[in-house]
Curated annotation (Swiss-Prot):
Keywords: Ribonucleoprotein, Ribosomal protein, RNA-binding, rRNA-binding. It comes from the Bacteria. Belongs to the bacterial ribosomal protein bL25 family. GO terms for molecular function: 5S rRNA binding; structural constituent of ribosome. It comes from Enterobacter sp. (strain 638). Part of the 50S ribosomal subunit; part of the 5S rRNA/L5/L18/L25 subcomplex. Contacts the 5S rRNA. Binds to the 5S rRNA independently of L5 and L18. InterPro entries: Rbsml_bL25/Gln-tRNA_synth_N (IPR020056), Ribosomal_bL25/Gln-tRNA_synth (IPR011035), Ribosomal_bL25_short (IPR020055), Ribosomal_L25_dom (IPR029751), Ribosomal_uL5_bac-type (IPR020930). The keyword Ribonucleoprotein applies. This is Large ribosomal subunit protein bL25. It holds the Pfam family Ribosomal_L25p.
């Protein structure tokens, strides 16, 4: 079971996303189900280390946002063209 911490994004847009990436974080979103979509930010190093493990893309993940757990699966991943970094991840509620 994978557990990842995240924070709700206060500011959205291209400039805010670039500032996140410069701070070694990246934007992501959780959508699906009855609840509204949630824009989040995640730590680059922690998620990169998790995504190299075998079941990251197939198993149900737990994302902890402000103490509340969300069960999700990875829907789409955008990676940097040549750096070992994630640009954006879409999660769908499980």
């Amino acid at each position: 079971m994978f557990t990842i911490n995240a924070e709700v994004r206060a500011v959205q847009g291209k400039g805010a996303s670039r500032r996140l990436r410069a701070a070694n974080k990246f934007p992501a979103i959780i959508y699906g189900g009855e609840a509204a979509p949630v824009a989040i930010e995640m730590d680059q190093d922690k998620v990169w280390n998790q995504q190299t493990k075998e079941g990251f893309y197939t198993e149900v993940l737990t994302i902890v946002i402000d103490g509340k757990e969300e069960k999700v699966k990875v829907q789409a991943v955008q990676r940097h063209p040549f750096k070992p970094k994630l640009s954006h991840v879409d999660f769908v509620r499980a």
